[in-house]
From Swiss-Prot:
GO terms for biological process: mismatch repair. It comes from Idiomarina loihiensis (strain ATCC BAA-735 / DSM 15497 / L2-TR). ATP binds at residues 620-627. This is DNA mismatch repair protein MutS. GO terms for cellular component: cytosol. Residues 806-837 are annotated as: Disordered. This protein is involved in the repair of mismatches in DNA. It is possible that it carries out the mismatch recognition step. This protein has a weak ATPase activity.
Length: 871
């Protein structure tokens, strides 16, 4: 939108002058400007909204001799349009008429009453019920070294949860962004966001002064009503406060209301949870599938029945904790909920509850709607039923958190009708009998039916018109209606109010006097009802903290019931946690997602990673199950640190601080990085940041480059992980030379995934056994994948040659053989004499070679060339 000087603004109509001044204060967002029954948009806002919302673009008046573009949406449907805009990442300022048109001279007074942004929405229609909607702020702790350390703060305005943490590197910052998935991100104008996974976030540059520590301290202490922040475990001079202060400033600016539901700031220390970097979260498919469909862990294992419970499940999944005392408390609760299928009855009740957490937040913001009050009342009425199921001592802490609120239930039962309308402006929300004055006004406004019937009968007799009727509509008010034929017989005091095709409508002084009384009573009745509605907020605000606490308890209970259901339905076992050492010992472990989605019975496998056996070198064919075996170990560790039972017959898990994965291969085209560059970047991150307490998953390291380079890198990485870092490592490879490391490296053991050959086919047993694989089955897998028969045949011929002429070198198991019929096509002959190696090179299909086959061919050619040179 073009900027206007004061002189240019003066050249517009008074209404447009008002619009331009308000728009200048909200230049970076769409302005919904209330005009009667519509919210209108002008200039560039109109063009943009017409494109985004597919609404008509018209014009109104002129500016600098050009028509002013205009678009609009009806006020009664505004929430639907807001939802669409927010989902597109747009921010909208809502400008309402606050003056009385009847008494206004010039334009009706207007002002922006709220600002809707992707990270600050609280309306039910604008939120995904099972996902957190986070506003996040970041800032460097040292402006001179902007990539050293970062303060990170996040706020879920729809619940009041407010967190503060720190990232010690740009890699940790990227991991936090992957974990939090912010709907909106605030950052100081002094830094760049390049390289962060923020595709879904609306990023907003903010002035540097909003990130000043002293400003933050003042805002936070004022919000919490304290003189310092030590009660929250935060030092008054804590540098990370800057990010929290920026969030609070932004929310106050957008909401333009008190924030009583934001009661505390929680500090999260990275060392208190298992750290999962961005690549690990992606590779393990915790909350997003890498393929099609909802096959990620969250989609498959989330058996909660309430929106609150589902969001709690996500929070525990995003941040698996290391506090064994708290984890064992959750295990105990799951065990108690499993008894007599107690979770079944509890979840039947929880399923009937509304989203108390978000309703309470709207109460705090004074934006709750009549239906919110009704659903809060009905949900709180069921809490005693829930608490009655929590008598077991392992559930007593939840019993104490989840309080009953009989006074609130009683208040809302008396005050709000059973099924109230959507908005208070429609009236009819406050129940009859709650307020004597309101009842009297309603009687005056609606209790005159008998009077109108009597008036109608009198006027029929007075006029002699038997079909005369007394009626009412919202446009013309009360009227007396007669047919066109009878209009000549009306008395002289009848004043025509409206002419229709076949009827005439009139008003008389007596009816006009009644209309004034009724309309006045209706206006007073609605005003009284709105006042009473506001008083409900005053009654409920002191209960907000306790209500939030109970809502949190209900969310935890639902998630624990989900864990109990998983344990009961799928034979999960209780993990045994050990603090003394880092280890993972599993008996009959399964992959929690594949087990549920596969039509075939899942083959369980053991795993042992201990101080005496820290690295497993895993070999076997593609599709054999190596990646599944590795991933299920990581997922079991994560589930155990959520407080969930795990898919195994027995699980002993030691102290794990981080999980790393180097799995899969793909280009990062957006950043201009090749497959190999992505692979090496992730590998470097592991080698720099893994500790002796870390679990590392390495799959096919080195395959993105030449055979010698790849083998050398894989060998060296395995050596470093084993000798230097001494972390728990699962190392899958097709370089069979690496199996020799079991004899060279300490605490390294070979295991393999079994497969059996049946004629021309291969059966994958998915069973993990000790020792290195005996065959690689590369040609059989290629055939299963649909590689053309003549290509398989050529590969078979070349493999046979290589196996007969192999001289020394590193040891590799032979390829399994297949009896294949030669294709009918003849190989063209060359009459001219030339180096036979060139013939072999022309016939070679490099796309169908494994790295090891390529290495062997190169070796063989080298030997042939040396022999021919010597002769």
């Amino acid at each position: 939108m073009p900027e206007f000087s004061d002189k240019q603004i003066q050249s517009h109509t008074p209404m447009m002058q008002q619009y331009l001044r308000i728009k200048a204060e909200h230049a970076d967002m769409l302005l919904f400007y209330r005009m009667g029954d519509f919210y209108e948009l002008f200039f560039e806002d109109a063009k943009r909204s017409a494109q985004l919302l597919d609404i008509s673009l018209t014009a109104r008046g002129q500016s600098n001799g050009e028509p002013i573009p205009m678009a609009g949406v009806p006020y009664h449907a505004v929430e639907n349009y807001l939802a669409r805009l927010v989902n597109m990442g747009e921010s909208v300022a809502i400008c309402e008429q606050i003056g009385d048109p009847a008494t206004s001279k010039g334009p009706v007074e207007r002002k922006v009453v709220r600002i809707v942004t992707p990270g600050t929405v609280t309306d039910e229609s604008l939120l995904a019920e099972k996902r957190q909607n986070l506003l996040v702020a970041i800032c460097p702790l040292n402006p001179k070294q902007p990539e050293a350390e970062y303060a990170i703060s996040s706020l879920e305005l729809s619940s009041g949860r407010f967190w503060l943490t720190k990232a010690h590197s740009s890699e940790q910052l990227a991991a936090e962004m992957q974990r939090l998935e912010p709907a909106e991100l605030l950052y100081p104008e002094s830094i760049s966001l390049a390289g962060l996974p923020l595709a879904k976030a609306k990023c907003k540059r903010r002035p540097a002064w909003e990130f000043e520590q002293q400003t933050a301290f003042m805002l936070l202490t004022r919000q919490f009503g304290t003189q310092h922040l030590e009660g929250f475990g935060i030092k008054n001079n804590e540098p990370t406060l800057a990010a929290a202060g920026a969030i609070l400033h932004y929310v106050k600016e957008t909401q333009r209301a008190a924030l009583p539901h934001i009661q505390a700031l929680i500090t999260e220390h990275p060392q208190d949870a298992i750290i999962l970097d961005a690549a690990t979260r992606r590779n393990l498919e915790l909350q997003q599938s890498m393929g099609e469909g909802d096959t990620h862990l969250s989609a498959v294992l989330d058996k909660t029945v309430s929106a609150m419970g589902s969001r709690q499940f996500q929070r525990w999944l995003q941040r698996p904790i290391r506090n064994h005392q708290e984890l064992n408390q959750r295990y105990d609760a799951v065990d108690a909920l499993k008894e007599n299928l107690n979770f079944e009855n509890i979840q039947l009740t929880l399923k009937q509850l509304a989203d108390i957490e978000r309703i309470v937040a709207r109460v705090g913001l004074r934006s709750a709607r009549p239906k919110d009050f009704a659903r809060l009342r009905d949900s709180l009425a069921k809490i005693p039923e829930v608490r009655a199921s929590l008598s077991h001592r392992s559930l007593s802490y939840l019993h104490d958190i989840i309080e009953p609120f009989p006074e609130v239930v009683d208040l809302l039962t008396k005050a709000v009708i059973e099924q109230p309308p959507l908005l208070i402006r429609d009236g009819g929300v406050i129940a009859e009998g709650y307020d004597k004055e309101l009842d009297e006004l309603r009687d005056l406004a609606t209790g005159a039916t008998d009077y109108l019937k009597q008036l109608e009968q009198r006027e029929r007799e007075r006029s002699g018109i038997a079909t005369l009727k007394v009626g009412y509509n919202r446009v013309h008010g009360y009227f007396i209606e007669v047919s066109r034929q009878s209009s000549e017989a009306v008395p002289d005091d009848y004043q025509r109010r409206q002419t229709l095709k076949n009827t005439e409508r009139y008003i008389i002084p007596e009816l006009k006097e009644h209309e004034d009384k009724v309309l006045n009573a209706q206006a007073r009745s609605l005003a009284r009802e709105k006042w009473l509605y506001d008083q409900l907020f005053e009654h409920l605000l002191p209960q907000v903290t306790a209500l939030q606490k109970s809502a949190s308890g209900l969310a935890q209970l639902d998630t624990l019931c989900c864990f109990a259901r998983l344990a009961d339905n799928y034979r999960y076992c209780r993990p045994q946690l050990q603090k003394e050492t880092s280890l993972i010992e599993l008996e009959a472990a399964r992959h929690p997602v594949i087990e549920q989605l596969s039509d075939e019975p899942f083959i369980a496998n053991p795993m042992s990673l201990t101080p005496q056996q820290r690295m497993l070198m895993i070999t076997g064919p593609n599709m054999g199950g190596k990646s599944t075996y590795m991933r299920q170990a990581a997922l079991i560790v994560i589930l155990a640190h959520m407080g969930c039972y795990v898919p195994a017959d027995k699980a002993i898990i030691g102290d794990i601080d981080r999980i790393f994965t180097r799995i899969g291969a793909s280009d990062d085209l957006a950043s201009g990085r090749s497959t190999f560059m992505v692979e090496m970047t992730e590998t470097a991150n592991i080698l720099h940041n893994a500790t002796a307490k870390s679990l590392v998953l390495m799959d096919e390291i080195g395959r993105g480059t030449s055979t010698y380079d790849g083998l050398s890198l894989a060998w060296s990485c395995a050596d470093y992980l084993s000798r230097q870092l001494q972390c728990l490592t699962l190392f899958a490879t097709h370089y069979f030379e690496l199996t020799e490391l079991a004899e060279e490296l300490p605490a390294t053991v070979n295991v393999h995934v079994d497969a059996k050959e049946h004629g021309d086919t291969i059966a994958f047993l998915h069973k993990v056994s000790p020792g290195a694989a005996s065959q690689s089955f590369g040609l059989q897998v290629a055939k299963l994948a649909g590689v053309p028969e003549h290509v398989i045949h050529k590969a078979k011929q070349k493999l046979s040659e290589l196996e007969h002429t192999h001289h020394g070198g590193l040891n590799e198991p032979k390829q399994a053989t297949m009896e294949l019929t030669p294709p009918p096509e003849a190989i063209p002959s060359h009459t001219e004499k030339r180096n036979p190696l060139l013939d072999e090179l022309e016939q070679l299909d490099i796309n169908d070679l494994t790295p090891k086959q390529a290495l062997d061919i190169l070796y063989q050619w080298q030997q042939k060339q040396k022999g021919s040179t010597q002769s």
